[in-house]
UniProtKB/Swiss-Prot annotation:
Pfam families per UniProt: UDPGP
Protein name, per record: UDP-N-acetylhexosamine pyrophosphorylase-like protein 1
Protein EC: 2.7.7.-
InterPro entries xrefs: Nucleotide-diphossugar_trans, UDP-sugar_pyrophosphorylase, UDPGP_fam
Family: Belongs to the UDPGP type 1 family.
Length: 511
């Protein structure tokens, strides 16, 4: 093809792209090199003119709609009925052990997988790499990815010991254009943290253009649209795009535990949760925590017009948020923590015909852009719309939905913000894990001593804020959730800190 034919082809492709009504994307066209023109056209052609036009219109309309007073759902809401709500706190030991046995049975039969939602960057943390690569400052310096990988390894070991057969819990990791490359390299550099490489399956979710408040797609440089992952609800399209369910079905997987990367306390494929859901015959389930206070800005799992969904705190009036049962507990108290159970047939139904019914949600963000002079601008206030789907919006399709309440201090401490914020920071995540390990060690019979050899007294709150009385970290390879520590720690005197119990064959190691 000669240069004139190439130019004609580029111009005709440009005209087709302009059918999207987004002609402003070509305002630097004459300044672009042939390679830059090709890159811009390829990006636009992946979107299709009609889809881009509809996406920008939808974003603009959603922004206008959500900028108005939020729609209140109070009169349409009902709490999760007691018969569909399990609880760690309100269940007897026998019942919890029965669910745990069922969960371990399914894990030992190679029927359980975990699926990590890891498409987001650590922007709010102040880093440019994936959140899973972040270290919150533990004595061991382990990252979120390493902690989670080691929990899977320990869980496989526990299930195998119980049932006398080797088992595998495959780990599916949904990444994005931003996180796939760094995540894959990180795992390769760390030998997949001891997991079989074939049992760690990474796949990529779709990207959508960021849109300005005027409905125009945003350029992040002269030849590139600003793009963002399509939310954690992009999972369902990604499962289809990458044939992930086919992989699961080929392995005999029947149950999938889905969770977000940023919860340092997450129990991977929690046998109690899995067993509860399987025992109830659930096709879809959610772990929840009790709301800390009525106005806590957390979504609530409940029924709306008879179907299950997560209602955002902005959709509930203060009066409804403060409503209480006769026993004094909040009526709408099931706080969503993005920790879910799905059967593979349920996921198959979602990607088969139900996914298009999921609504998009508006996220108002600060989106870097090029101004009319071609200069890169990093805005100090929100200037753009990112459209997202939410993973939990499929609850409405469940035929048998259940919820399972767990203790916040044992299972939920998200990492979202830099340490300049008040909550959900590296410091709060680190403290949550160290407090948990301190409690485990004390229950196992460990004696923590100060520099004079005197016992360190527990603080007034053993679930507390601030640092624990003694800094103690327990490797997930030693204990998944506090089990089996007596042989290492019962009647042990520990006086050198920080203290790390690193592996089941190494014994206690002061750092």
């Amino acid at each position: 093809m000669d240069r004139s034919e190439s130019a004609e082809s580029a111009e005709s492709r440009r005209r087709r792209a302009e059918e999207s009504g987004q002609g402003q994307l070509f305002r630097f066209w004459d300044e672009l090199s042939p390679a830059e023109k090709e890159a811009l056209l390829e990006q636009l052609e992946m979107l299709e003119p009609r889809e881009l036009r509809e996406h920008c219109q939808r974003a603009r309309e959603a922004y206008v709609r959500e900028s108005s007073a939020p729609q209140r759902l109070d009169d349409r809401m009902q709490p999760v009925p007691p018969e569909f709500l399990g609880s760690v706190r309100h269940s007897g030991t026998g019942e919890l052990e029965r669910w745990e046995r069922e969960g371990f049975h399914q894990i030992a039969q190679n029927k359980v997988a975990v699926l990590l939602l890891a498409g987001g960057q650590g922007t709010r943390l102040g880093v440019t790499y994936p959140k899973g690569m972040y270290s919150v400052g533990l004595p061991s310096a382990k990252t979120l990815y390493q902690i989670q990988a080691e929990r899977i390894r320990r869980l496989q070991q526990l299930a195998s010991e119980r049932h006398g057969e080797t088992c595998t819990v495959p780990w599916y990791i949904m990444t994005s254009e931003f996180t796939l490359g760094p995540t894959r390299k990180f795992f390769e550099d760390h030998a997949y943290f001891g997991l079989e490489r074939s049992d760690v399956v990474m796949f990529e979710q779709r990207m959508l253009p960021a849109v300005g408040f005027d409905g125009a797609a945003i350029l992040e440089d002269k030849a590139k649209l600003a793009m963002a992952p399509d939310g954690n609800g992009g999972l369902y399209r990604a499962l289809s795009d990458n044939r992930i369910l086919e992989d699961m079905e080929g392995r005999g997987i029947q149950y999938v535990h889905v969770y977000c990367v940023d919860n340092i306390l997450v129990k991977m494929a929690d046998p109690v949760f899995i067993g509860f859901c399987v025992s109830k015959g659930a096709d879809c389930g959610a772990k929840v925590v009790e709301k800390g206070y009525p106005a806590e800005p957390v979504g609530v799992v409940c029924r709306v017009d008879g179907v299950y969904q997560v209602v955002e705190y902005s959709e509930i009036s203060p009066e409804t948020a403060e409503k209480r049962n006769p026993n004094g507990a909040l009526t709408f108290t099931a706080g969503n923590i993005c920790n879910h159970f799905f059967t593979v047939p349920f996921l198959r139904a979602v990607i088969g015909s139900l996914e298009p019914r999921l609504n998009y949600h508006v996220a108002i963000k600060k989106v870097p852009y090029v101004d009319n002079e071609g200069n890169l601008v990093k805005p100090t206030s929100p200037n753009g719309i990112k459209m997202e789907k939410f993973v939990f919006d499929v609850f409405q399709f469940a035929k048998n939905f259940v919820a399972f309440e767990v203790l916040r201090e044992e299972e939920f401490s998200p990492l979202k913000n830099a340490d300049t914020a008040d909550k959900d920071t590296p410091t709060t995540a680190r403290r949550a894990l160290l407090w948990q390990h301190y409690r485990w060690a004390r229950r196992a019979g460990t004696h923590f001593l100060d520099e004079t050899g005197s016992p360190i007294r527990d603080s007034h709150s053993i679930s507390g804020e601030g640092d624990p009385p003694a800094v103690c970290e327990i490797s997930p390879l030693v204990s998944y959730f506090g089990e089996g520590l007596e042989s290492y720690m019962k009647d042990k005197d520990v006086s050198s800190f920080p203290f790390v119990l690193e592996s089941s064959d190494a014994g206690p190691v002061p750092v």
